[in-house]
Amino acid sequence: MSYDHKAIEKRWQTYWDEHKTFKTAPETSGKPKYYVMNMFPYPSGQGLHVGHPESYTATDIMARFNRMRGFNVLQPMGWDAFGLPAEQYAIKTGHNPADFTNENIKHFKKQVKSLGFSYDWDREINTTDPEYYKWTQWIFEQLYKKGLAYEDEIMVNWAPDFPGGGIVVANEEVIDGKTERGSYPVYRVPMKQWVLRITKYAERLLSDLDDLDWPEAIKEQQRNWIGKSTGAAVFFKVDGKSDYQVEVYTTRPDTLFGASYMVLAPEHDLVDKITTSECRADVDAYKAKIASKSDLERTDLNREKTGAFTGAYGINPVNGEKIPIWIADYVLSSYGTGAIMAVPAHDTRDYEFAKKFDLPIRQVIKGGDISKEAFTGDGTHINSAFLDVLDKKQAIEKIIDWLEEHDAGHKQVNYKLRDWIFSRQRYWGEPIPVIHWEDGKQTLVPESELPLRLPHLNQDQMKPSGTGESPLANAKSWLEVTRQDGVKGRRETNTMPQWAGSSWYFLRYIDPHNDKVLADPEKLKYWMNVDLYVGGAEHAVLHLLYARFWHKFLYDLGIVPTKEPFQKLVNQGMILGTNHEKMSKSKGNVVNPDEIVDSYGADALRVYEMFMGPLTQSKPWSTESLAGIRRYLDRVWRIFTSDGDGINPIIVSENDHKLDKIFNQTVKKVTEDYAAMRFNTAISQMMVFINETFKAEKLPKKYMNAFLQLLNPVAPHITEELWQRMGHQETIAYATWPTYDESQIIEKQIEMAVQINGKVRAKINTPVDISRDELAKMATDNPDVKKQVADKNIVKIIAIPGKIINIVVK
């Protein structure tokens, strides 16, 4: 007998909606809080894929589990709805991005609701809602006031031949030096951008990782991205140009005696000033040649090294040697000082460059064979004057002392982390609330006038402005403003990146309808920080780092009560195709969750995705295994029901105690496994329990009710239905979580082998608390043992309960 999943799921989803079953209780409820959330989705036109329910079910299990354990649970959902795909679609089709984004959200929400997640929908947020991005703009204004938001000339990807007069494209839209759409040539050019000074928080972002319950791999990725290192700044004067010096940062100042040339990034501001007339043409040609290369291409270790000589020389401060200054694309202006001292004997990239351009290679650390390759290991110093015979640590300390004493450099802590380029030349994003005035002044839009709303643009206005500005430059009536004193101004045309709205959304869920403040301080104090945050590992760095940065900034302002937003982070594994490949349309292996829900039911999909394997591991999809889960749920249905609407008559009030042990084992294991997010093994244990119920003559009602509670977090619809049929008037959602009796789990009997003269001749079941004499009597009374010793004399019996029985005979 199969249950009607369509009718049951529709009935309970309607019930939960109408009764607002999962509306979060007030902060004054007196209950301890549990704040659990997923990384909110971008509502694409494609809708949900089977990867979404995996992480959503995981958080829903934790939400439902903790509600029954007496926690006040906040589990919200929202939409990260700004983004490039919507704008590209709008330009292509002529539809307004706001309109079809809202349509996408409706479709997404319908799909999410069909899976029975226990969200508090009264807290739903949408990053494109002006009442939401009012506060995104407000945070930007606070950053601006504190000097953490500023404008700077930044290298961008500029496609001047793009239809409409040119466009700035993101790194991910550049393929082999051309635009993804239309294959127009892309050039790296400087353009004014808004930048956030995340580097001011580098040390705190690094050190506070230690206090977080996050996967170590994610923390390590953030540490590497922040990239703290200790080394030295070294100053090289330019020969013949006493006004100029090149500053380099190096973690190995001890190799200074091995520096045989220098390399500047082609964009370095000294390049034009120091290049000689003889080398000017080569340098200009080289700069033009690499203008379209992305940072990723430029730093590819497998690429052949290229460069151009400037004709200038730097003076090595430690020995006065003149060394040639080159430019090369493998040095980036955005990292360090945009200049390096090259020690080819001990650096692989420098070695390859030196070999290609026939530059000197001078060994200063003992070891290896530098005629074949760079030696990058540790060793004692050679050819290094006063550093000779010192090891790495000693030499670094000594050379830094020397540099500081001679004003030629100093010890320095450096970070790989760069300031966050915050502006995009796009329409579909939060407007940056800044006005540029004709008199050169720059002001923020007054807080009382926020939100600064996006103007409606038609299809023609949505096209590139042709100036490198966003399409907002085409919205003249919105763009141009006049001050009270008659001075004219222009609004900022750049918009914020998609990361902006997701950098603080977890705070707005706490108080989503407050129009006076970002969120009520008392509510923030009660709910923060997030107890469990679940999402993909692909957001390991950018989203999580930006959210931590904004949160720390708001903490410094006294807005939020915690230093960190997310206490525990879990990354779900990927659901792969049946062939273990990533699901994609091109491979034809995409599974549509709507079809699964229609054919097998939402509960079957939820249970299956949790049963596939550990949450954090990648797993291949199997429709056969899904069908097996559906059969299991049908078995659950059959053990509880009889024909019609009745309950199975063997479910009775009295307890014959035959299920005591398996029931208590199941409650214990499921409770512990849910708490540790081991959902697959919890489900396995519940399968064992149901198998045992089919062998029983009577099923205690107390145990069967409790089983429904155990299964409910994974399969909420079928359990709500059966809970009601068991005679309950209220929803199962807030029923008190079952407890177990440890004494019922402990083994009351154990099997022991009986040896005769050291050989096993029989096996007996004995009580665990049996005495030695009783154990000896049980052994000798055993019929098999009696036969073996019938014609023999028993010399002695060694009987140790729980360990050994050995009868010695002659």
UniProtKB/Swiss-Prot annotation:
Its EC number is 6.1.1.4. CDD domains: Anticodon_Ia_Leu_BEm, LeuRS_core. Keywords: Aminoacyl-tRNA synthetase, ATP-binding, Cytoplasm, Ligase, Nucleotide-binding, Protein biosynthesis. Its main location: cytoplasm. It is an enzyme of class 6 (ligase). InterPro entries: aa-tRNA-synth_I_CS, aa-tRNA-synth_Ia, Leu-tRNA-ligase, Leu_tRNA-synth_edit, M/V/L/I-tRNA-synth_anticd-bd, Methionyl/Leucyl_tRNA_Synth, Rossmann-like_a/b/a_fold, tRNAsynth_Ia_anticodon-bd. A motif ('HIGH' region) lies at residues 41-52. GO terms for molecular function: aminoacyl-tRNA deacylase activity; ATP binding; leucine-tRNA ligase activity. Belongs to the class-I aminoacyl-tRNA synthetase family. This is Leucine--tRNA ligase. It comes from Oenococcus oeni (strain ATCC BAA-331 / PSU-1). The gene is leuS.
